[in-house]
């Protein structure tokens, strides 16, 4: 099985699993249908499964057209009335089998109130939608900042070699903010320089080990990150207080 990011909109990735022997493909968060239909038809593949992480349109917008094209396609997603056409509603603690893959469902609210992620422990793959980005994290919409903080703490506990399949190409912009928070972080500096050598390349998947070294939202226990937060109005150096300031500062960062 091959994993391929199919681009959608300006910066979305639709992560796609391709099994050419079986003649099928599966995808995560198809915000647009056309790129999937084109790819499937050009490779003579049938869409078997759709995995959804949350209700935002740039993640579910293609579902209606895709299930019209492939009516037998299974659609997994969180229990949320804002998402239509989910054939298999799922929640924390359940598992989903996609071909030979067995995904554990992780409940990760914060970005939205019902956000979930798909974790495949045997392969070490995490499909985390908009909860975790490389060097960043999602904004808070209808979830809470406390929930988002807890969701990222959960990701910190995953094995360090876990590959992180984020839904957006935000890495370089996130690194610029990370460099503002930790200007002496050599991992951030080196990664920025690496990306600048191939600025149009896909930076994903990332991995937990890398994120622990570059992502300020996973580094709230580090002294320089705490000092940044305290200098920008944090009530204390407690992890949640630091996280709140980081998220607020990132919201207006340009």
UniProtKB/Swiss-Prot annotation:
Q: Which domain of life is it from?
A: Bacteria
Note whether Lipoprotein occurs among the keywords.
no
Where Zn(2+) 1 binds, per the record, is at 54, 56, 111, 130
Task: State how the cofactor is bound.
Answer: Binds 2 Zn(2+) ions per subunit.
Identify the gene encoding this protein. Answer: gloB
| Protein name listed in UniProt | Hydroxyacylglutathione hydrolase
What are the GO MF terms of this UniProt record? hydroxyacylglutathione hydrolase activity; metal ion binding
InterPro entries assigned? Clx_II_MBL, Glyoxalase_II_hydrolase, HAGH_C, Hydroxyacylglutathione_Hdrlase, Metallo-B-lactamas, RibonucZ/Hydroxyglut_hydro
Gene3D superfamilies, alphabetically?
Ribonuclease Z/Hydroxyacylglutathione hydrolase-like
- Give the enzyme class: hydrolase
Which EC number(s) does the record attach to this protein? 3.1.2.6
Subunit structure of this entry? Answer: Monomer.
The pathway to which it is assigned is: Secondary metabolite metabolism; methylglyoxal degradation; (R)-lactate from methylglyoxal: step 2/2
Give the GO biological process terms. methylglyoxal catabolic process to D-lactate via S-lactoyl-glutathione
